[in-house]
């Protein structure tokens, strides 16, 4: 039997806007976050529909973990179609609330439809968009992000990190409209593997995109192997930059030490983390950096860049080490330190396990449910 909603006692009809669904080959941490939350809301008795972009071989409609997914055009047509598709959806099958998931191009739903709206914000791109997509798309994204404070003057928002909240406030969103709720973790799946020493395997996880800066990890591996000759690197993920990264590996003569796995199922990712001596995240910006917490839960400390999102998920010196962004030498030094200093490593592993135990998808779902009720109750009041 489905659980009843915890906050209002009434089942809500929810429409979610997010470019990708969980089956999209480009799905990442944002999509995991969306489905972990909304599948729980479905279990509590709510109905959830997601309007997402299509991709090669995708069915126009499907149901994933109880969430009904309707796919529109491809990623390039999707944002132009959303205003019309949303209005048609609401006209034929009304909803109690629309949830904008803000991590790519903003939807600006309050200007599109007269319906209660709230938002889940992973991160906004700002100028990092110019290092991920073509200039015209990046410019349009940056300009559209400037409209968010005007469209969402009184929209209840859930930010997944203090860094994201600070970015929203700096852009003009009222602090009282934002609650910070970090992602959760499946503690039943993410756990340490067999005890014993781990080989010096370094794992890097993420989409192979420019702003993720996997090239910095590859360059650092050259220095790391001078101190730890048997250090190896597994790069997990897919993306447009793979060819460029593979060429860099060849130029640095690291073919025998670097593995590109492509996209792999979650169970295999967990196996890598349970074997890893170290996780590295070199991204220029993250909403939170959930892979860091997943690694902590599997007994792998991390070295990450000191940037928004990652400085929220890493407790420097307690669960991992933070280094300056794109600093190859600093990354190499920190990685060698974790790989060779056993007392430090033991302290980071213990701190990481304790830290990871604090993250709960149920709490994140509770907060989302409360935000939805707030959006419905406050609709029509105007800015506060």
Regions flagged by a language model, labelled:
Residues 163, 184:
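Carbohydrate-associated surface elements
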Residues 316-317, 321-328, 337-342:
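Conserved acidic donor-binding segment of nucleotide-sugar-dependent glycosyltransferases
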